[in-house]
Amino acid sequence: MSEALNVDIQEIAKFEKMAATWWDPDGEFKPLHQLNPLRLNYIDQTSGGLFGKKVLDVGCGGGILSESMARLGANVTGIDMGNEPLEVARLHALETGVSLNYERCTAEEHREVNREAYDVVTCMEMLEHVPDPLSVIAACCDMVKPGGYVFFSTINRNLRSYVETILGAEYLLKMLPVGTHDHGKFIRPSELIAMVDQTELLCKDATGVTYNPITGTFRYTSSVEVNYMIATVKPLE
């Protein structure tokens, strides 16, 4: 862990090694490609539409979500600390002609010159990969405008999530490389909401996400036992 930055060097290194396959729909990031339509729809519908809005994607990686939000007409900036994923993201945007901006920085660094600058902030599948998730949540709160939405997604920490996400997805189904996740870093919904409550953000909605290995598709569910997303809003002043 860096002393100055909220970064886990080992986590960054894992995703640097896999970066070349980020946009392969049948590669190591296949689950993200399968999940993306669901999370994109949730963000778009819950926020009242992304078209014309200024959006920040925290922990954007290779840009799967960032690019899809830009395709809906959002003015998107994606930030990440991985050099290789960002290079992949920039190259793919050039190849596909999608206009958006990528920067290498932490959420805390980006906040210094972007307070209350965004209509929507997304932080998806990222909190379980940093040493201090509360610090990221606070930075996201500071960067969204009053009345704007901040979205988080992560994985619950319990026996079922260990069986499905690590034993199932990494070891049995080979959906993800072994070691992608650390069960000890998963975040219970109560813990996430407790952290959100330490900021100005108000939790407005939560939904679970479940995977069907037979059809290879994700769908919404009322259960937040494994994967889940929450929508928060910053109150108007």
Swiss-Prot record:
**Gene transcribed to yield this protein:** ubiG
Q: Which UniProt keywords apply?
A: Methyltransferase, S-adenosyl-L-methionine, Transferase, Ubiquinone biosynthesis
Question: InterPro entries from the entry?
Answer: SAM-dependent_MTases_sf, UbiG_MeTrfase
Query: What reaction gets catalysed by this protein?
Result: a 3-demethylubiquinol + S-adenosyl-L-methionine = a ubiquinol + S-adenosyl-L-homocysteine + H(+); a 3-(all-trans-polyprenyl)benzene-1,2-diol + S-adenosyl-L-methionine = a 2-methoxy-6-(all-trans-polyprenyl)phenol + S-adenosyl-L-homocysteine + H(+)
Q: In which pathway does it act?
A: Cofactor biosynthesis; ubiquinone biosynthesis
Q: Which PANTHER family match?
A: METHYLTRANSFERASE, UBIQUINONE BIOSYNTHESIS O-METHYLTRANSFERASE, MITOCHONDRIAL
Extract the GO molecular function terms from the UniProt entry: 2-polyprenyl-6-hydroxyphenol methylase activity; 3-demethylubiquinol 3-O-methyltransferase activity; polyprenyldihydroxybenzoate methyltransferase activity
State the Gene Ontology BP annotations: methylation
Function (record text): O-methyltransferase that catalyzes the 2 O-methylation steps in the ubiquinone biosynthetic pathway.
Q: Which family does it belong to?
A: Belongs to the methyltransferase superfamily. UbiG/COQ3 family.
Q: What is this protein called?
A: Ubiquinone biosynthesis O-methyltransferase
Residues that bind S-adenosyl-L-methionine: 39, 59, 80, 124
List its EC numbers. Answer: 2.1.1.222, 2.1.1.64
Supply the source organism for this entry: Shewanella amazonensis (strain ATCC BAA-1098 / SB2B)
- Has UniProt tagged this entry with the keyword Nucleotide-binding? no
